């Protein structure tokens, strides 16, 4: 029986890795081993940062809400407590958007939160 080499399989595997490595710099794009190493690292970063993104946005929303609350003579924690007591169920993403783009509506929500305290 004849010996089977990995020519076609190897070429396909290399092409797949090099295709995913497009956009990398220098040898990390052209050389298979470096491309494979960088690709593994890149996938780890992507996995980690998909989770970190959620935390980062939540922190950003809280900073924006806090800044708008301070303009309405409230702290962030008292504002959130007032919302819970008033039964207003808006998430932080929506509240941050209102704080940035519609300050009049946010001021009304802040007043409702103050009354509930």
Curated annotation (Swiss-Prot):
One of its GO terms (cellular component) is ribonucleoprotein complex. Pfam families: Ribosomal_L20. Keywords: Ribonucleoprotein, Ribosomal protein, RNA-binding, rRNA-binding. It comes from Campylobacter jejuni subsp. jejuni serotype O:6 (strain 81116 / NCTC 11828). NCBIfam families: rplT_bact. CDD domains: Ribosomal_L20. The keyword Transmembrane helix does not apply. Binds directly to 23S ribosomal RNA and is necessary for the in vitro assembly process of the 50S ribosomal subunit. It is not involved in the protein synthesizing functions of that subunit. Belongs to the bacterial ribosomal protein bL20 family. This is Large ribosomal subunit protein bL20. InterPro entries: Ribosomal_bL20, RIBOSOMAL_L20_CS, Ribosomal_protein_bL20_C. GO terms for molecular function: rRNA binding; structural constituent of ribosome. One of its GO terms (biological process) is translation.
